Amino acid sequence: MHNLRNILFVITLIGQKYGLTSSQNKELCDVTSSTGLLDSIKVMASHVKEQLKDKGTSEVAQPIVSPDPTDCADILLNGYRSSGGYRIWPKSWMTVGTLNVYCDMETDGGGWTVIQRRGNYGNPSDYFYKPWKNYKLGFGNIEKDFWLGNDRIFALTNQRNYMIRFDLKDKENDTRYAIYQDFWIENEDYLYCLHIGNYSGDAGNSFGRHNGHNFSTIDKDHDTHETHCAQTYKGGWWYDRCHESNLNGLYLNGEHNSYADGIEWRAWKGYHYSLPQVEMKIRPVEFNIIGN
């Protein structure tokens, strides 16, 4: 999976360098996926040859700004530095259309594509206690609280290597963060299984336990516990037996008497404190090299 994903990413970079169109890039990715790398190289050579006709070397050597940014890091590199809503074109989403996403252009250099936000936006406390289809397709308002959608998160995280960042805030406005390298999920056929790498940050490692586990919701029990974790803890998440983080749980806004069913990050606040504000966001791992 990773080898194919990396090949598709390199092919797209080459296409951008030589000014290939979106349809030409899509043809390259389709050929690579279906018939192999050799056929893809032949198609790519043909397209590049067409682009080089009647062009001087000085023109070809100029960097080409991608007309179809694939994530918020691309948007930042294209010169847009304000946080807010943007349109992107993930590579594996081309046949479906564009995605509207919220870009965080301020945190740690910017370029983050936000995939989840919780806050006090007037929705019911159980707003995130939804069935599989809602988590599959996404819900909410990207300017407020929302879940981007597991299909979309899959499309994003399988086009290149990403890290994920969790930004957490308590009622006293104290903040913590956690970063995990090499974050990606599998598709629906594989129950959106979670994959993450090494942890860093000051929030404590409350997501690492969920690595390798499938997504569960109120109507789909894919955890490893004898009970139904999503029903018990009132959210959609990569539960195992059951959780050390529950960022899609009930919005309980601080301390609560119930056990572990709020927006929990155990390593920082334990199981009786529901965080009033959290964000989950992703950025390409190589951004730290090419983006700064």
From Swiss-Prot:
GO annotation, biological process: cell-cell adhesion
Residues recorded with modification Pyrrolidone carboxylic acid: Q24
SUPFAM superfamilies in the cross-refs: Fibrinogen C-terminal domain-like
Pfam families recorded: Fibrinogen_C
Residues spanning the membrane: none
Residues covered by the Fibrinogen C-terminal domain: 63-286
SMART domains recorded: FBG
Keywords assigned by UniProt, alphabetized: Calcium, Disulfide bond, Glycoprotein, Lectin, Metal-binding, Pyrrolidone carboxylic acid, Secreted, Signal
Assembly behavior: Multimeric. PubMed:10468566 and PubMed:11707569 are in disagreement about the nature of the multimer, PubMed:10468566 finds hexamers and octamers, the results in PubMed:11707569 suggest tetramers.
Name by which UniProt lists this protein: Techylectin-5A
